[in-house]
Amino acid sequence: MDQYLTVNVVTPDGLVYDHHAAIVVARTTAGEIGILPKHAPIIVPLTIDEVRVKRTDSDTHVDWIAVNGGIMEVRDNVVSIVADSAERERDIDVSRAERAKQRAERQIAEAKEKEDTNELKRATVALHRAINRIKVSKHS
């Protein structure tokens, strides 16, 4: 393949992902976007969701990455994702994600009972992150 994308995902903890890809699909605040080689330069905010990367080294291999917010910049066939946190499907500890989901559900119930809107928002984000990690882990 003459044209490909270089994809890297970086978090405050360091580099999470670095490969060549034929296409990258991510969810932005405006909806899903697919990035192919020669895409116009763009910077978009990402939501808590999965990023799909179809690699160039296999016609069928897709890498799945749980991304918890951040931004994606596309320029000169380089897709750079700077995320609050991110995990590849193979690195997700499902039991830990399940515990985080249960903890967030408890916190949501407690926040509703106390009518604590700030805690409700925090717990809701934690729940979305846990659900996203669980969803992405099922692709491995």
Curated annotation (Swiss-Prot):
Positions of disulphide bridges: none
Compartment(s) of residence: Cell membrane
Protein keywords: ATP synthesis, Cell membrane, CF(1), Hydrogen ion transport, Ion transport, Membrane, Transport
Molecular-function annotations in GO: ATP binding; proton-transporting ATP synthase activity, rotational mechanism
Pfam families per UniProt: ATP-synt_DE, ATP-synt_DE_N
Entry-linked Gene3D superfamilies: ATP synthase delta/epsilon subunit, C-terminal domain, F0F1 ATP synthase delta/epsilon subunit, N-terminal
Topology relative to the membrane: Peripheral membrane protein
Highest rank taxon of the organism: Bacteria
Any one GO CC term of the record: plasma membrane
Primary location recorded for the protein, binned into one broad class: membrane
Function summary: Produces ATP from ADP in the presence of a proton gradient across the membrane.
Complex and partners: F-type ATPases have 2 components, CF(1) - the catalytic core - and CF(0) - the membrane proton channel. CF(1) has five subunits: alpha(3), beta(3), gamma(1), delta(1), epsilon(1). CF(0) has three main subunits: a, b and c.
NCBIfam families tied to this protein: ATP_synt_epsi, PRK00571.1-3
Family: Belongs to the ATPase epsilon chain family.
Descriptive protein name: ATP synthase epsilon chain
Organism from which the protein derives: Enterococcus hirae (strain ATCC 9790 / DSM 20160 / JCM 8729 / LMG 6399 / NBRC 3181 / NCIMB 6459 / NCDO 1258 / NCTC 12367 / WDCM 00089 / R)
Organism placement in taxonomy: Bacteria, Bacillati, Bacillota, Bacilli, Lactobacillales
